[in-house]
Amino acid sequence: EQALSALDEDLEQVANSVPKSAFTYLKRVTIWVEHEQDFPGGVYHPSAQWLLNNGYPEEWAKGIQIGNAANYMSWVEQQPAMVLHELAHAWHHQRLGYDDPDIEAAYTAAMESGIYDEVAYASGGTAEAYAKTNKQEYFAELTEAWFWRNDFYPFVRDQLIEHDAL
């Protein structure tokens, strides 16, 4: 119950942060919360086939899985915008398409410039930004910074505007 209450609060934060039209769409994305699955966090599932091949229900396609309600509270301490991050994957996949040329161009330019090679991390120190993983993670990480707070630098919108020309 504590995790579901925290998830409700996080979704309220998302509702208050993103444009209303975007949140109206994002409310359609199903979020599956599992009690104690051995799963490392939250994940957006774009593919029904992948789910079937890996023993998960195909109904989870185009939805978000939070793999362990008991761990949700500790996850969001390190990644406060975790739900927004996964919803950003849904938006990217369903509304923009993973082949969106603007996102591809921004990701390529950012990777070529090296601006995410070593950045500050919210809990201290520096690390390679998770945004470097691929263009999907780039979009989701920058969405966190734009609308809420990211766990990797740039943490918030003003820093993002200064750090990444997009």
Each predicted region: which residue ranges?
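Acidic/His-rich structured neighborhood in mature extracellular/periplasmic domains
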Residues: E1-E112
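Metalloprotease/metallohydrolase-associated module, dominated by Zn2+-dependent proteases
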Residues: L52-W60, G67-A69, M73, E77, ...
